[in-house]
Amino acid sequence: MPAERRRRAVTLASRLVAAAISLTAAAGAFFLFLQFGSTDGLDSMDITRSVLILVSTSWLGWGAAHAVLGLFSRPQRPANVSPDAPISTRTVILVPVYNEDPVATFSRIAAMDASLAATPWRDLFHFAILSDTRDEAIAARERFWFLRLLRERDAEGRIFYRRRAVNRGRKAGNIEDFIQKSGSAYPFAVILDADSLMEGETLVDMVRRMEAEPRLGLLQTLPVVTKARARFGRSMQFSAALHAPVFARGLAMMQGRTGPFWGHNAIVRVQAFAESCGLPELSGPPPFGGHVMSHDYVEAALLARAGWIVRFDDDIRGSYEEGPENLVDHAKRDRRWCQGNLQHGRILFAPGLCGWNRFVFLQGIMAYIAPLFWLGFIMASIAAPFFAPPLDYFPVPYWPFPVFPSDETWKAIGLAVGIFGLLLLPKLMIAIEAIVTGRAAGFGGAGRVLVSTLAELVFSSIIAPILMAFQTRSVLQVLLGRDGGWPTNNRGDGSLSVAQAWSASHWIVTWGLIGIGATYYFAPGLVPWLLPVALPMIFSPLVIAVTSKRSRSALFTMPLEVAPTPVLLAHDAILADWERSPAPEAVPALAVSHA
């Protein structure tokens, strides 16, 4: 099949281009630093720092390669899927909840049901709310709002609720329980998070694509972050809206038929999922043993191992989620992901997995240990003067004239420029692409896109050392055997006082003060280089508190604020109506599963 051969060629070429960019950047950084460090004689610390720079820069280069590939491609709808084709397959939309606000969650379901009602296919879709809530007060509110949801949407027999008595296996176990007991009634299942929202036409189109490709086991969409209000949340939301589609296109080109599963806003073929995705309970205690935490990537790998296509279609629109509004909530969520990704080291060599899936596991691990390489480089640079050999101005015997070390400062400057280029250029190039293609209009125009992009670069530079500190602590906690558990997601405005921010980050202040103090004492020449890292850490409580406040600036405007889609408007209206309702009274237990 020419089309299949072409697809494989594109996938292979994309991977080779990305690898070439990553390796070229890494090799250049390695040799530049090696030459810079050898001006006073090469020592073990110079070699150590060069290796740390090599690993760290290769990771930056790999990320930049996603943007490069994405900039040279465009979203493409699968040729075998007509946008108007009828559908005939019954599909269940799964909404797992765990101690969530039922008003916010159930109003999203009401909005999606209303959006589906605007299509001819609503009766083919059912919703199943799968509660693992442990808080009895929240469970009572879930029952109240479920009954209101049924009544307002006239949804008896289309929207279901069940609450497990024992939440074995967390979210993955919750879905597995439904698949085992009720999955046979539905060929397809859309998996959402509690904060997910999807257009009715998007849900229909996902079913079309599944029907058009019988070997398609899982189809992942790119969720767009919406409804952020705080400065931190809006910055992340803008970056995701502007940059993520381009990075996602690059990712889709590389992954081919062994794509990702991000755990939500995706559709699965129930038979494939049931036959292939039974997750083992890993031997030993958490954090490396027990239930698989980041189950989504493992399930994608198991589907691919069984011969199913796992695809990421970056052209699908109308898929939404909400994100953390402050740095602390982001770090809490990231702590869970860190443990799950490091746990993948136990699965890396499982038999039969595709090579690309193993590489994806490695990428996930590297995403969290990368800060350790940068931290190691900083510490090695502080310690380097103690390992440097004494300067020898007369290295040639009997030569009467001194030989001075060559000045290699330009190489250090070139290295710094190259590293910052890998960090900054992809985002600047994406902003230019948005202006050239007209995409910038949705963000308020070319001028606002450029200003917002520059502001986001400054903002991300300030918070990067704080995020690095949180990630480093998370990795160390996991390596020391500390289980992060299954914390409830915090949703809402996320505003934090300075006292709350201090409680969450005082240890970062301590790290920053110790780091800059040690640098001043042992290697004072490095102080100017480390100030951009140390100052945000020292002032982290203030940074966290200020960025958690509601933003009233026109910066970081994104298209869904300029032109909200029907399902977003419907959700806003339903949520506002429900929030005006009086608090529910006690509601009798209902539809509880004792699995």
Curated annotation (Swiss-Prot):
Report how it sits in the membrane.
Multi-pass membrane protein
Q: Where are the transmembrane segments?
A: 13-35, 50-72, 365-387, 414-436, 449-471, 526-548
* Pathway field: Glycan metabolism; osmoregulated periplasmic glucan (OPG) biosynthesis
Q: Name one GO cellular component term.
A: plasma membrane
Share an example GO biological-process annotation for this protein: biosynthetic process
Gene Ontology MF annotations:
hexosyltransferase activity
E.C. numbers: 2.4.1.-
The keyword Ion transport is assigned to this record: no
Q: Which UniProt keywords apply?
A: Cell inner membrane, Cell membrane, Glycosyltransferase, Membrane, Transferase, Transmembrane, Transmembrane helix
Q: Where in the cell is it found?
A: Cell inner membrane
> What PANTHER family is this protein classified in?
CELLULOSE SYNTHASE CATALYTIC SUBUNIT A [UDP-FORMING], GLUCANS BIOSYNTHESIS GLUCOSYLTRANSFERASE H
Q: Which family does the record assign?
A: Belongs to the glycosyltransferase 2 family. OpgH subfamily.
Instruction: Quote the function comment for this protein.
Output: Involved in the biosynthesis of osmoregulated periplasmic glucans (OPGs).
Q: Which NCBIfam families match?
A: PRK05454.2-1, PRK05454.2-2, PRK05454.2-5
- Protein name per Swiss-Prot or TrEMBL: Glucans biosynthesis glucosyltransferase H
